Amino acid sequence: MDNLLKDMGKRIFDRRKQLNMTQETLAELAHVTPQTISTAELGQKAMRPETILKVCDALHISTEYLLRGVITEA
């Protein structure tokens, strides 16, 4: 599970940087705390399912990409 959390965290971090967002901006857009974003990016704590959905929406990525690194075509 640790590798999954670290991989998810890296995908969040990379996408956030790609969008030129701060952790604070992402937190505002996802309606979560900056601490939630920080711990997720570091792979320190699993996110709740509803938080995953909000973060994915804010980053304009699919849950499949966040969880598995798979890019799906629309």
Name each model feature, range by range.
Residues 1-18:
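A short, Lys/Arg-rich alpha-helix, primarily the initiator
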Residues 15, 29, 40, 69:
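Residues in the recognition helix of alpha-helical DNA-binding motifs
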Residues 17, 28, 57:
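Alpha-helical residues within the helix-turn-helix
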Residues 20-39:
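Short alpha-helical DNA-recognition segment
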Residues 50-65:
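DNA major-groove recognition helix of helix-turn-helix/homeodomain DNA-binding modules
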Residues 57, 67-74:
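Short, charged recognition helix plus adjacent turn
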